[in-house]
Amino acid sequence: MKSCRTLIFVAIILNGLSTFVAHAGAESKVHIVYLGEKQHDDPEFVTESHHRMLWSLLGSKEDAHSSMVHSYRHGFSGFAAKLTKSQAKKLADLPEVVHVTPDSFYQLDTTRTWDYLGLSVANPKNLLNDTNMGEEVIIGIVDSGVWPESEVFNDNGIGPVPSHWKGGCVSGENFTSSQCNKKLIGAKYFINGFLATHESFNSTESLDFISPRDRSGHGTHVATIAGGSYVPSISYKGLAGGTVRGGAPRARIAMYKACWYLDRFDINTCSSADILKAMDEAMHDGVDVLSLSIGYRFPYFPETDVRAVIATGAFHAVLKGITVVCSGGNSGPAAQTVGNTAPWILTVAATTLDRSFPTPITLGNNKLILGQAMYTGPELGFTSLVYPENPGNSNESFSGDCELLFFNSNHTMAGKVVLCFTTSTRYITVSSAVSYVKEAGGLGVIVARNPGDNLSPCEDDFPCVAVDYELGTDILLYIRSTGLPVVKIQPSKTLVGQPVGTKVADFSSRGPNSIEPAILKPDIAAPGVSILAATTTNKTFNDRGFIFLSGTSMAAPTISGVVALLKALHRDWSPAAIRSAIVTTAWRTDPFGEQIFAEGSPRKLADPFDYGGGLVNPEKAAKPGLVYDLGLEDYVLYMCSVGYNETSISQLVGKGTVCSNPKPSVLDFNLPSITIPNLKDEVTLTRTLTNVGQLESVYKVVIEPPIGIQVTVTPETLLFNSTTKRVSFKVKVSTTHKINTGYFFGSLTWSDSLHNVTIPLSVRTQILQNYYDEN
């Protein structure tokens, strides 16, 4: 059995619905057989070698072909096949096989965004116009498909398809290849892994389409944010009005549908075998950026684990110069929940915009309170207001908890606006409360809760308004102060700019990285709350095919759009250089210079575990001055440092590898961040900077040390010229703390007259190692 640190291919727990029967009657399930770097350039030869391996195992060519689910033959070598446990073990024991693992399932994790980030078309000299809006760049998206009729995929004024494109569009149910154009240049679907497990999936009864066509709207929304064309005069029933467009509005979109809608569960699910096939095809087709708003439920798997499928596919993509952008997950605000943590992936957190939807609530004492809602119905004039509680002389059951409103009798809530309190920030709490009140004949709901970022319209445009506990208590005190409390609720308004502050979203998954704590995740943050973009026309709450959605799923394509522009401007930059440019130039405040907070309980100032380097600053990222670059040798150093065995590394990279003894330190991995999770004794680490700015330049170091941490940099000045383009420096770090601490944060900046190249410092002192303190 190979080491648990062996480099492997990804999959996840199979749900056991597959009933394929092998020779001995044992249950067969889809397994992914990972063979590492492909040994031949001819994809047909690679696939034939996969069939031969299966033929040798199963005994006949027919069985080999019927067992095969996918052949991975472009970016790497491997295949997915239906195998019994014993068959999988026989393959795993072959020397040419890196690993075999069962298939598994992943889940799916803008009118204002781009102006907010400074990418306005009104400025003739900016990144957007300097790159012709990304016209020669191809953004590949692995998601739930595409709704090709949406206006955001119009190709008005767009030139010929880029010459490096090798892909195409595949016809299927309710989708023909003719629906592609010079904007939507690719559309494929991958369902074999899904069908092998969900054999009961009935295409005639399912709401999904066995084609690239989107059912859920998620993929269409993501594609809009990354590279949608201009569509003017869009709003949601009058809210958030403006022009919808993507970050790179002339970039080309290639959709790879690998996520499928399960009607009985009302969810999208994505087979790891299908995800890998989609990534493999995208590498072959010639995409420049790969965007995946897909994640796996916690706990996560290291990139050395077979189940970390996206990490494995992403590694091969990055080696081919393709930047891979992934959502960080929606499991916040708890710490150590960030996903997609492989160090070659650009992992994205979600923030709010400088936009809100204040909703006037007027009490009977004329006090005005501004709640938050997406209420676009008519004004609800002064109406009875109630908080269900026992007045002291009743045997009835009362509850003012939003989750328990069903305990109240109908006459308690009928014809009234109901105030309730909840500790939850999840939208399901609001929707449940609305359902209870509507069934009882109520006319509206005011929900008092912790601050959250899950604002959505309520069904049938029912008045449902969120307030915090302080304002909720003000309303409750008013109710208790009078015998006939009343309230008026007016439609929501759109407020843009100051005084609306930027926050890291409550749901956005947080660091530190639970897999490899020395690798900072997330890398960067971008708007992902209440983003208005295209969807399918059958979606609830859509207005003319546009909808508000929130999630790191929306933040990731924002970064993908920025990456597309940077790729158009700097064709020779590696994925690591692009990541560095984005991270080192990010705002640590909002665009107006105000501090960024992180939603949670309690709300706090954001730190690198909330937003990585900060909020993306596209204009600055275009001219970073210096970058922390990475190449194959750096990735090999990283793999050696975290314990990959040499055989696995060799198979992965396609050439012999020998790790040094002693093994290198992961702290020397040339990331645009420094994270030390277990500082006890003094450590010295190395970073290397590459000049991508002015040929003759001088940079001086500026250090903001974490509290109680001593940081020394040598040398303090870096000189670049025509012969010196790469310079290394050493960072010596020690602690003055005498106890185990939490993380403290600082920064290290290299500055000249034009650039500030900043990386976050995150340091935790651990005098007693591997110790968990619950005091």
Swiss-Prot record:
Pull one GO CC term from this UniProt entry: extracellular region
Span of the secretion signal? 1-26
Question: Where in the numbering of this chain does the PA domain appear?
Answer: 384-476
**Molecular function terms, GO-annotated:** serine-type endopeptidase activity
Subcellular localization is given as:
Secreted
PANTHER family reported in the protein's UniProt record: PROPROTEIN CONVERTASE SUBTILISIN/KEXIN
Protein name as annotated: Subtilisin-like protease SBT3.8
Higher taxonomy = Eukaryota, Viridiplantae, Streptophyta, Embryophyta, Tracheophyta
